A protein has these predicted regions:
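C-terminal substrate-recognition "lid" of short-chain dehydrogenase/reductases
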Residues: 198, 231-266
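Catalytic loop of short-chain dehydrogenase/reductase
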Residues: 114-120, 144, 152-198, 210-211
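Conserved glycine-rich Rossmann-like NAD(P)H-binding loop of the short-chain dehydrogenase/reductase
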Residues: 37-52
Length: 267
Protein backbone atom coordinates (compact mmCIF):
# COMPACT_ATOMS: atom_id res chain seq x y z
CA UNK A 1 0.00 0.00 0.00
CA UNK A 2 1.30 3.46 -0.91
CA UNK A 3 1.76 6.08 1.77
CA UNK A 4 -0.06 9.41 1.91
CA UNK A 5 2.71 11.38 0.20
CA UNK A 6 2.77 8.91 -2.68
CA UNK A 7 -1.00 9.07 -3.13
CA UNK A 8 -0.94 12.87 -3.14
CA UNK A 9 2.07 13.22 -5.44
CA UNK A 10 1.59 14.44 -9.01
CA UNK A 11 5.27 14.15 -9.86
CA UNK A 12 5.74 13.33 -13.54
CA UNK A 13 2.16 14.27 -14.43
CA UNK A 14 0.96 17.22 -16.50
CA UNK A 15 -2.14 19.32 -15.82
CA UNK A 16 -3.90 21.63 -18.28
CA UNK A 17 -6.05 24.35 -16.74
CA UNK A 18 -8.36 26.57 -18.77
CA UNK A 19 -8.99 30.03 -17.37
CA UNK A 20 -5.46 29.66 -16.05
CA UNK A 21 -4.79 33.39 -15.79
CA UNK A 22 -7.76 33.92 -13.49
CA UNK A 23 -7.83 33.89 -9.70
CA UNK A 24 -9.11 30.34 -9.21
CA UNK A 25 -7.41 28.79 -12.23
CA UNK A 26 -4.01 30.06 -11.15
CA UNK A 27 -4.56 29.09 -7.51
CA UNK A 28 -5.26 25.51 -8.61
CA UNK A 29 -2.20 25.59 -10.85
CA UNK A 30 -0.06 26.55 -7.87
CA UNK A 31 -1.54 23.76 -5.76
CA UNK A 32 -0.90 21.12 -8.42
CA UNK A 33 2.58 22.50 -9.04
CA UNK A 34 3.41 22.10 -5.35
CA UNK A 35 2.31 18.46 -5.67
CA UNK A 36 4.82 18.02 -8.51
CA UNK A 37 2.77 18.46 -11.69
CA UNK A 38 3.92 20.20 -14.82
CA UNK A 39 1.46 22.93 -15.76
CA UNK A 40 -0.18 24.16 -18.96
CA UNK A 41 -2.13 27.38 -18.49
CA UNK A 42 -4.72 28.21 -21.16
CA UNK A 43 -6.35 31.63 -21.33
CA UNK A 44 -7.45 34.25 -23.86
CA UNK A 45 -5.39 36.93 -22.10
CA UNK A 46 -1.98 36.21 -23.62
CA UNK A 47 0.04 38.73 -21.62
CA UNK A 48 -1.49 37.73 -18.30
CA UNK A 49 -1.19 33.99 -18.83
CA UNK A 50 2.45 34.34 -19.89
CA UNK A 51 3.16 36.33 -16.74
CA UNK A 52 1.47 33.63 -14.66
CA UNK A 53 3.74 30.98 -16.17
CA UNK A 54 6.84 33.06 -15.38
CA UNK A 55 5.60 33.26 -11.80
CA UNK A 56 5.07 29.49 -11.60
CA UNK A 57 8.53 28.72 -12.93
CA UNK A 58 10.17 31.15 -10.53
CA UNK A 59 8.33 29.82 -7.48
CA UNK A 60 8.32 26.08 -8.12
CA UNK A 61 11.19 25.39 -10.55
CA UNK A 62 9.02 23.22 -12.77
CA UNK A 63 8.10 22.90 -16.42
CA UNK A 64 5.19 25.19 -17.25
CA UNK A 65 3.89 26.61 -20.52
CA UNK A 66 1.16 28.99 -21.57
CA UNK A 67 -1.28 28.81 -24.46
CA UNK A 68 -3.40 31.72 -25.60
CA UNK A 69 -6.57 30.40 -27.21
CA UNK A 70 -10.30 30.86 -27.60
CA UNK A 71 -11.91 27.73 -26.17
CA UNK A 72 -15.05 28.36 -28.23
CA UNK A 73 -13.08 28.11 -31.49
CA UNK A 74 -13.31 24.51 -32.73
CA UNK A 75 -10.18 24.83 -34.87
CA UNK A 76 -8.10 26.07 -31.96
CA UNK A 77 -9.40 23.25 -29.76
CA UNK A 78 -8.59 20.66 -32.45
CA UNK A 79 -4.98 21.83 -32.51
CA UNK A 80 -4.63 21.66 -28.73
CA UNK A 81 -3.62 17.99 -28.26
CA UNK A 82 -0.77 18.29 -30.74
CA UNK A 83 0.49 21.44 -29.04
CA UNK A 84 0.27 19.77 -25.64
CA UNK A 85 2.19 16.72 -26.83
CA UNK A 86 4.87 18.83 -28.51
CA UNK A 87 5.39 21.03 -25.46
CA UNK A 88 4.91 18.57 -22.60
CA UNK A 89 4.86 15.06 -24.08
CA UNK A 90 1.78 13.95 -22.16
CA UNK A 91 -1.44 15.01 -20.44
CA UNK A 92 -2.80 13.55 -17.22
CA UNK A 93 -5.19 16.15 -15.80
CA UNK A 94 -7.66 18.50 -17.48
CA UNK A 95 -9.30 21.19 -15.34
CA UNK A 96 -12.09 23.10 -17.05
CA UNK A 97 -12.15 26.36 -15.11
CA UNK A 98 -12.76 28.98 -17.81
CA UNK A 99 -16.29 30.35 -17.55
CA UNK A 100 -18.59 33.29 -17.79
CA UNK A 101 -19.67 33.93 -14.21
CA UNK A 102 -22.26 36.04 -12.45
CA UNK A 103 -19.96 39.06 -12.29
CA UNK A 104 -18.95 38.94 -15.97
CA UNK A 105 -19.69 42.15 -17.84
CA UNK A 106 -21.92 41.19 -20.75
CA UNK A 107 -24.93 42.68 -22.48
CA UNK A 108 -28.16 41.37 -20.98
CA UNK A 109 -26.39 39.19 -18.40
CA UNK A 110 -26.90 40.01 -14.71
CA UNK A 111 -30.19 41.79 -15.34
CA UNK A 112 -33.89 41.00 -14.72
CA UNK A 113 -35.25 37.98 -16.59
CA UNK A 114 -37.10 39.90 -19.30
CA UNK A 115 -33.92 41.84 -20.11
CA UNK A 116 -31.60 38.81 -20.41
CA UNK A 117 -30.14 38.59 -23.90
CA UNK A 118 -30.47 35.50 -26.11
CA UNK A 119 -27.09 35.96 -27.77
CA UNK A 120 -25.45 36.25 -24.37
CA UNK A 121 -27.27 33.05 -23.34
CA UNK A 122 -25.75 31.28 -26.35
CA UNK A 123 -22.31 32.67 -25.57
CA UNK A 124 -22.55 31.38 -22.00
CA UNK A 125 -23.48 27.91 -23.23
CA UNK A 126 -20.52 27.92 -25.62
CA UNK A 127 -18.02 28.93 -22.95
CA UNK A 128 -19.40 27.14 -19.90
CA UNK A 129 -20.64 23.91 -21.46
CA UNK A 130 -19.87 23.27 -25.13
CA UNK A 131 -16.17 24.03 -24.73
CA UNK A 132 -15.91 21.44 -21.96
CA UNK A 133 -17.37 18.77 -24.23
CA UNK A 134 -15.01 19.77 -27.04
CA UNK A 135 -11.93 19.83 -24.83
CA UNK A 136 -12.76 16.46 -23.28
CA UNK A 137 -13.28 14.99 -26.74
CA UNK A 138 -9.97 16.28 -28.08
CA UNK A 139 -7.92 15.54 -24.95
CA UNK A 140 -9.31 12.06 -24.28
CA UNK A 141 -6.69 10.17 -26.35
CA UNK A 142 -3.84 11.76 -24.37
CA UNK A 143 -5.63 11.33 -21.05
CA UNK A 144 -6.33 7.68 -21.87
CA UNK A 145 -2.62 7.03 -22.45
CA UNK A 146 -1.84 8.51 -19.05
CA UNK A 147 -3.35 5.60 -17.07
CA UNK A 148 -4.04 8.26 -14.42
CA UNK A 149 -6.34 10.50 -16.46
CA UNK A 150 -8.56 12.90 -14.55
CA UNK A 151 -10.97 15.59 -15.78
CA UNK A 152 -12.20 18.14 -13.24
CA UNK A 153 -15.06 20.44 -14.21
CA UNK A 154 -15.57 23.58 -12.16
CA UNK A 155 -19.32 23.87 -11.68
CA UNK A 156 -21.43 25.83 -9.20
CA UNK A 157 -24.02 25.43 -6.48
CA UNK A 158 -26.34 27.21 -8.90
CA UNK A 159 -26.12 24.18 -11.14
CA UNK A 160 -27.85 22.36 -8.28
CA UNK A 161 -29.94 25.03 -6.55
CA UNK A 162 -32.35 27.69 -7.67
CA UNK A 163 -31.17 31.20 -6.75
CA UNK A 164 -32.57 33.24 -3.90
CA UNK A 165 -32.95 36.53 -5.76
CA UNK A 166 -33.46 38.43 -2.50
CA UNK A 167 -29.67 38.25 -2.09
CA UNK A 168 -29.28 40.68 -4.95
CA UNK A 169 -32.02 43.22 -4.21
CA UNK A 170 -30.68 46.76 -4.20
CA UNK A 171 -27.29 45.73 -5.65
CA UNK A 172 -25.73 45.64 -9.11
CA UNK A 173 -25.26 41.88 -8.83
CA UNK A 174 -27.48 39.22 -10.36
CA UNK A 175 -27.86 35.53 -11.12
CA UNK A 176 -28.31 34.96 -14.87
CA UNK A 177 -30.44 32.06 -16.05
CA UNK A 178 -27.75 31.08 -18.55
CA UNK A 179 -25.17 30.70 -15.79
CA UNK A 180 -27.34 28.33 -13.78
CA UNK A 181 -28.44 26.35 -16.84
CA UNK A 182 -24.90 25.97 -18.16
CA UNK A 183 -23.56 24.83 -14.80
CA UNK A 184 -26.42 22.38 -14.34
CA UNK A 185 -25.65 21.04 -17.79
CA UNK A 186 -21.98 20.79 -16.86
CA UNK A 187 -22.80 18.60 -13.86
CA UNK A 188 -24.84 16.25 -16.05
CA UNK A 189 -22.11 16.26 -18.71
CA UNK A 190 -19.72 15.23 -15.94
CA UNK A 191 -21.92 12.20 -15.21
CA UNK A 192 -22.12 11.31 -18.91
CA UNK A 193 -18.37 11.59 -19.42
CA UNK A 194 -17.66 9.65 -16.23
CA UNK A 195 -19.58 6.61 -17.46
CA UNK A 196 -18.35 6.83 -21.04
CA UNK A 197 -14.65 7.54 -20.48
CA UNK A 198 -14.24 4.95 -17.73
CA UNK A 199 -12.20 3.05 -16.79
CA UNK A 200 -9.30 4.93 -18.38
CA UNK A 201 -10.28 8.47 -17.34
CA UNK A 202 -12.06 9.68 -14.22
CA UNK A 203 -14.40 12.69 -14.54
CA UNK A 204 -15.67 14.72 -11.59
CA UNK A 205 -17.03 18.18 -10.84
CA UNK A 206 -16.49 20.70 -8.07
CA UNK A 207 -19.53 22.86 -7.39
CA UNK A 208 -18.36 25.94 -5.57
CA UNK A 209 -20.28 28.50 -3.59
CA UNK A 210 -19.76 32.25 -3.85
CA UNK A 211 -16.09 33.24 -3.91
CA UNK A 212 -15.27 36.56 -2.26
CA UNK A 213 -14.33 39.25 -4.78
CA UNK A 214 -14.54 42.36 -2.61
CA UNK A 215 -18.31 42.02 -2.48
CA UNK A 216 -20.04 44.96 -0.85
CA UNK A 217 -22.99 45.30 1.50
CA UNK A 218 -25.80 44.42 1.69
CA UNK A 219 -25.00 41.35 -0.44
CA UNK A 220 -22.10 40.22 1.74
CA UNK A 221 -24.07 40.10 4.99
CA UNK A 222 -27.00 38.40 3.27
CA UNK A 223 -24.79 35.71 1.78
CA UNK A 224 -22.97 35.07 5.05
CA UNK A 225 -26.29 34.71 6.88
CA UNK A 226 -27.35 31.96 4.45
CA UNK A 227 -24.03 30.11 4.87
CA UNK A 228 -23.49 27.97 8.00
CA UNK A 229 -19.75 28.73 8.02
CA UNK A 230 -20.70 32.43 7.94
CA UNK A 231 -18.43 33.58 5.10
CA UNK A 232 -17.87 33.44 1.38
CA UNK A 233 -15.24 31.14 -0.08
CA UNK A 234 -11.66 31.99 -0.95
CA UNK A 235 -9.54 30.34 -3.63
CA UNK A 236 -7.73 28.44 -0.88
CA UNK A 237 -10.97 26.69 0.08
CA UNK A 238 -11.16 25.01 -3.34
CA UNK A 239 -7.59 23.72 -3.49
CA UNK A 240 -8.07 20.62 -1.36
CA UNK A 241 -10.92 19.45 -3.56
CA UNK A 242 -8.90 20.05 -6.72
CA UNK A 243 -5.83 18.24 -5.43
CA UNK A 244 -7.97 15.36 -4.17
CA UNK A 245 -9.66 14.83 -7.54
CA UNK A 246 -6.44 15.30 -9.51
CA UNK A 247 -4.42 12.81 -7.47
CA UNK A 248 -4.62 9.13 -6.62
CA UNK A 249 -6.40 10.03 -3.39
CA UNK A 250 -9.54 9.81 -5.54
CA UNK A 251 -8.51 6.88 -7.72
CA UNK A 252 -11.87 5.16 -7.07
CA UNK A 253 -13.98 8.29 -7.49
CA UNK A 254 -15.69 9.22 -10.75
CA UNK A 255 -19.00 10.84 -11.64
CA UNK A 256 -19.01 12.78 -8.38
CA UNK A 257 -20.08 16.40 -7.86
CA UNK A 258 -18.11 17.63 -4.86
CA UNK A 259 -19.89 20.62 -3.33
CA UNK A 260 -17.63 23.15 -1.62
CA UNK A 261 -19.93 25.89 -0.36
CA UNK A 262 -19.52 26.36 3.39
CA UNK A 263 -22.83 24.59 3.93
CA UNK A 264 -24.89 26.98 1.76
CA UNK A 265 -26.76 24.06 0.17
CA UNK A 266 -27.26 22.16 3.44
CA UNK A 267 -30.37 24.02 4.62
Amino acid sequence: MRNIKQLMSLKGRVALITGGAGHLGFAMAEALAQAGAGIILVDMDQAKVQARVVDLKKKYKLKAVSMSMDITDKNEIKSLPQQVFQKMGRLDILINCAALVGTSYLKGWAVPFLEQDLETWRQAMEVNLTSVFALAQQCFPLLKKSKNGSIINIASIYGVLGPDMSLYEGTKLGNPAAYAASKGGLIQLTNWLATNLAPEVRVNAISIGGVFRNHQEPFLSRYKKKTPLNRMATEEDILGAALYLASDFSQYVTGHNLIVDGGFSAW
